[in-house]
């Protein structure tokens, strides 16, 4: 029997507000353990939560970006459970009335077709702290993350393959990143994914029993975990067994999913309205004000890059993968940069440098201005493409003016025949054996002089001019 795969994803996104959702503590990542805490985070008796308006702004922005309806009379609920990193023994979340509902985004599949994926809901909540287990036999609780604002985005079960899930996550990450409400860095925990997967016989409308996958710390691991779980469930069903509703974790080493626990239902959390927070009236004016802050989104930019700048769909997709790179490209073109040349540099040397240094484009010295300046120096023959790579590395590490560095470092390309011809004659004098080979008609003997000339000029000879002059002087040499 053949089965259809059914996948839904729950994505937790940390919002990049300065302070936490219900306390004034810093929400920034990477501080010393328990440095970003106060009495609210520790749940001291008598303390009350105070709503951070910026979190609601971010929630509205996310809902609009994901084509969602907005609950304009919004409230919070208590989700009750006990765990050491949750000192209140409940989490403030949203249950029956999330800030956003009935949304959708489009994904692009490998064959170029597009598919709409519905989004059931997006709700605001506080993050939990973090448990660490020491080698000394003790467990430690770090509450820096406790109360950091989250938005959980829950898709409908519209995906039919691990590849579609990967495409959905890619599109969702781009959209959230463009809104500016989160940096969506999985390596720092600001984007976390849980995947729900079930199988059903083709033609059956009713969903099968699902398993939830956790410990998915990259999009590739989401795909790998789903592929393994797809195979595991199919094997169980074909052997006459039944799938249990359970939570499983993905083991990156073995590539397998491993049982963690039997999955709880929402009734296990005993949700009820949060009594210490009021209802929040989200007015039409409030929504309209946030709507004005929405950016141009990746799909819109991709269409513009193809139609207005003549780039390929592939180039447009690469440039818009991160907002920082796309913004850099747009500014470079706006100040006169050739779109194709800027695109080539961003996808080539710049991307390689960023990967090798593990940095983003905002963290290096390269700017739209000095990149366009450098491309202009190539175009007017001041430097060669080879020399430009050296110039780029300097700009990336140190910033500054491309032209000033080229002059200071003596990298200006030699194009003057009155300078090049004496150098060519000196090359002949320094390589008598090669001259004899050339005069005797030895095959490819002339090509050796190209390397000698470039070496003599330290790579600064203008290749087109130098090759033309070299051919001219070799012809004279042959006649002697």
Curated annotation (Swiss-Prot):
Quaternary assembly: Heterotrimer of A, B and C subunits.
Domain of life (superkingdom): Bacteria
Enzyme class: ligase
NCBIfam families in alphabetical order: gatB, PRK05477.1-1, PRK05477.1-2, PRK05477.1-4
HAMAP family listed in its UniProt record: GatB
Protein name: Aspartyl/glutamyl-tRNA(Asn/Gln) amidotransferase subunit B
GO biological process: glutaminyl-tRNAGln biosynthesis via transamidation; translation
Protein's job: Allows the formation of correctly charged Asn-tRNA(Asn) or Gln-tRNA(Gln) through the transamidation of misacylated Asp-tRNA(Asn) or Glu-tRNA(Gln) in organisms which lack either or both of asparaginyl-tRNA or glutaminyl-tRNA synthetases. The reaction takes place in the presence of glutamine and ATP through an activated phospho-Asp-tRNA(Asn) or phospho-Glu-tRNA(Gln).
Catalytic activity, as annotated: L-glutamyl-tRNA(Gln) + L-glutamine + ATP + H2O = L-glutaminyl-tRNA(Gln) + L-glutamate + ADP + phosphate + H(+); L-aspartyl-tRNA(Asn) + L-glutamine + ATP + H2O = L-asparaginyl-tRNA(Asn) + L-glutamate + ADP + phosphate + 2 H(+)
InterPro entries, per database record: Asn/Gln-tRNA_amidoTrfase_suB/E, Asn/Gln-tRNA_Trfase_suB/E_cat, Asn/Gln_amidotransferase, Asn/Gln_tRNA_amidoTrase-B-like, GatB, GatB_C_1, GatB_Yqey_C_2, Gln-tRNA_amidoTrfase_suB_CS
Pfam families linked: GatB_N, GatB_Yqey
Organism: Streptococcus agalactiae serotype V (strain ATCC BAA-611 / 2603 V/R)
Family recorded in the similarity comment: Belongs to the GatB/GatE family. GatB subfamily.
EC number: 6.3.5.-
UniProt keyword list: ATP-binding, Ligase, Nucleotide-binding, Protein biosynthesis
PANTHER family found in the cross-reference section: GLUTAMYL-TRNA GLN AMIDOTRANSFERASE SUBUNIT B MITOCHONDRIAL AND PROKARYOTIC PET112-RELATED (PTHR11659), GLUTAMYL-TRNA(GLN) AMIDOTRANSFERASE SUBUNIT B, MITOCHONDRIAL (PTHR11659:SF0)
GO MF annotation list: asparaginyl-tRNA synthase (glutamine-hydrolyzing) activity; ATP binding; glutaminyl-tRNA synthase (glutamine-hydrolyzing) activity
